[in-house]
Swiss-Prot record:
<feature type="transmembrane region" description="Helical">
    <location>
        <begin position="75"/>
        <end position="95"/>
    </location>
</feature>
<keyword id="KW-1133">Transmembrane helix</keyword>
<dbReference type="Pfam" id="PF25129">
    <property type="entry name" value="Pyr4-TMTC"/>
</dbReference>
<dbReference type="GO" id="GO:0016020">
    <property type="term" value="C:membrane"/>
</dbReference>
<keyword id="KW-0456">Lyase</keyword>
<feature type="transmembrane region" description="Helical">
    <location>
        <begin position="48"/>
        <end position="68"/>
    </location>
</feature>
<comment type="similarity">
    <text>Belongs to the paxB family.</text>
</comment>
<protein>
    <recommendedName>
        <fullName>Terpene cyclase esdpB</fullName>
        <ecNumber>4.2.3.-</ecNumber>
    </recommendedName>
</protein>
<feature type="transmembrane region" description="Helical">
    <location>
        <begin position="208"/>
        <end position="228"/>
    </location>
</feature>
<feature type="transmembrane region" description="Helical">
    <location>
        <begin position="19"/>
        <end position="39"/>
    </location>
</feature>
<dbReference type="InterPro" id="IPR039020">
    <property type="entry name" value="PaxB-like"/>
</dbReference>
<feature type="transmembrane region" description="Helical">
    <location>
        <begin position="140"/>
        <end position="160"/>
    </location>
</feature>
<dbReference type="GO" id="GO:0016829">
    <property type="term" value="F:lyase activity"/>
</dbReference>
<feature type="transmembrane region" description="Helical">
    <location>
        <begin position="112"/>
        <end position="132"/>
    </location>
</feature>
<feature type="transmembrane region" description="Helical">
    <location>
        <begin position="177"/>
        <end position="197"/>
    </location>
</feature>
<keyword id="KW-0472">Membrane</keyword>
<comment type="function">
    <text>Terpene cyclase; part of the cluster that mediates the biosynthesis of shearones, diterpenoid pyrones (DPs) which are structurally diverse meroterpenoids consisting of a diterpene linked by a pyrone, and which may exhibit a range of bioactivities. Within the pathway, esdpB takes part to the biosynthesis of the molecular scaffold by catalyzing the cyclization of the prenyl group initiated by protonation and ring-opening of the epoxide to produce the diterpenoid pyrone scaffold.</text>
</comment>
């Protein structure tokens, strides 16, 4: 992972090195806040607003780059390790409440921990294979973008399918959106100011994935607002009817 040896970067990158570090720190902190908020919201509503599919994918990616291909950059290694540790509890809470839900079939409820473990192992082998094929640094960012789009798409689909905001919250969406809104452009900044090491990141597929993320997460915010407002209107109407009775 020579790309993380910022001391070897050209002078133009050194001038904005503080910006790159700040962007990564903001993005990393935002995702930690998102995970913690996800846990709190799930405990409050006794349901998770994130799919186990996307959480297993995230955990597999975090395991590969916190344990197997640990970045030599201190902040990056520390942030990914914290993500891994917190995400383990996110998955625990999600599995716990999914097994209590009547929307899940009895067969799946009984075997959900095993299914979750198999999903994690499946994604883990995929991220390891991607690292062997592309190299650790490229796999870290390509895999990370795939995780991002998968999480955003599945969260949006879950919100639309349920038609209610239980298990979700504005803080969950906003922390995720802010974290990735800093992290994604940060990769392109590296490509512009250090093209010999990071030029591979500036391509049409990475731009497409970035655009899809923004489209999905902005749509999530708009739909969440619409559903939340409808819930408040129904609640207000119910209160008025109760008073009349």
């Amino acid at each position: 992972m020579d790309e993380f040896d910022f001391n070897a970067a050209p002078p133009e990158f050194q001038e904005i090195r503080w910006m790159v570090a700040s962007i990564f720190l903001i993005s990393g902190t935002g995702w930690i806040v998102n995970y913690v908020t996800t846990i709190r919201t799930a405990l409050r509503d006794r349901t998770s607003g994130v799919t186990l599919l996307s959480l297993c994918n995230n955990l597999a990616w975090e395991t590969v780059f916190a344990v197997i291909h640990r970045p030599p950059h201190l902040i990056a290694a520390l942030v990914i390790t914290v993500w891994l540790l917190v995400n383990i509890y996110v998955i625990y809470v999600s599995v716990k409440f999914a097994r209590e839900s009547q929307d899940v079939s009895p067969l799946l409820r009984r075997h959900l921990p095993v299914v979750t473990l198999l999903g994690f192992v499946g994604f883990l082998t995929g991220h390891i294979a991607l690292s062997m094929h592309l190299g650790p640094t490229k796999a870290l960012y390509w895999g990370g973008m795939i995780c991002q789009v998968t999480l955003s798409a599945s969260a949006l689909g879950l919100l639309i399918q349920r038609g209610h905001t239980r298990g979700a919250s504005p803080a969950m969406w906003l922390s995720r959106f802010i974290a990735s809104s800093f992290g994604v452009p940060g990769l392109f900044v590296r490509a512009v100011y250090w093209p010999s090491a990071w030029g591979w990141a500036d391509n049409i597929l990475m731009r497409w994935l970035s655009g899809v993320f923004f489209l999905l997460d902005l749509s999530y915010g708009a739909i969440y607002y619409h559903i939340s407002r409808s819930e408040h209107e129904v609640g207000a109407s119910g209160s008025k009817m109760s008073k009349r009775e």
